Amino acid sequence: MQTQVLFEHPLNEKMRTWLRIEFLIQQLTVNLPIADHAGALHFFRNVSELLDVFERGEVRTELLKELDRQQRKLQTWIGVPGVDQSRIEALIQQLKAAGSVLISAPRIGQFLREDRLIALVRQRLSIPGGCCSFDLPSLHIWLHLPQAQRDSQVETWIASLNPLTQALTMVLDLIRQSAPFRKQTSLNGFYQDNGGDADLLRLNLSLDSQLYPQISGHKSRFAIRFMPLDSENGQVPERLDFELACC
């Protein structure tokens, strides 16, 4: 069986921001528990980048709008024959609950911004080698605390993002499930189509081809060019089958 690689590409700025936030939150938990300097720097660097993303836009406002939009979409299915009504109603209630929690939560990321250790590490991350023990003795001593004490603090930091994480997970799940994958074929490594007001492109490509997509465009129209991973010797077939979902 062929191994399929999933590529996702945002077609607007809000989706680009959401995918970056999702990626960074996932990265926070990859190397847990934090047991050494490398794991700590990975964690704090992702926290810092996450706070940078939060400062660039109205993340909460856009998410609340999307939660409301998804509720309205689901309400159009109420009463439609053959549709699982209990599932629809449960999703609507979950969206409402996520919105209520998000709107009543403190400013997104504020708890992390106000943490002294996070602030000290953030100041040094842009300096090459700036997180040595003599630059950050506070981080050095923190790494020598009992593991359980560090774990508890990390859990508290991550938990402060729960209102955002829960709302974002629901929104992205619904968007990803909003359109099925359909087989498409590129000619000479190129494919273009209308986006149909989509927010996100999802593309499944066989690993055997050792190709990757370069995607450009916006919600009304997009283009995909397939490129060989080996830029010198790799080849792009005249016809290439792949699966595409416009969500």
Curated annotation (Swiss-Prot):
SUPFAM superfamilies membership: YacF-like
Compartments (UniProt record): Cytoplasm
Chief location: cytoplasm
Coiled-coil ranges from the UniProt annotation: none
GO cellular component: cell division site; cytoplasm
Record key words, sorted: Cell cycle, Cell division, Cytoplasm, Septation
Annotated GO biological process: division septum assembly; FtsZ-dependent cytokinesis
Pfam family, one: ZapD
Spans traversing the lipid bilayer: none
NCBIfam families for the chain: PRK05287.1-1, PRK05287.1-3
Known function: Cell division factor that enhances FtsZ-ring assembly. Directly interacts with FtsZ and promotes bundling of FtsZ protofilaments, with a reduction in FtsZ GTPase activity.
Assembly behavior: Interacts with FtsZ.
Family listed: Belongs to the ZapD family.
Protein name: Cell division protein ZapD
Species in which this protein is naturally found: Escherichia coli O17:K52:H18 (strain UMN026 / ExPEC)
Organism ancestry: Bacteria, Pseudomonadati, Pseudomonadota, Gammaproteobacteria, Enterobacterales
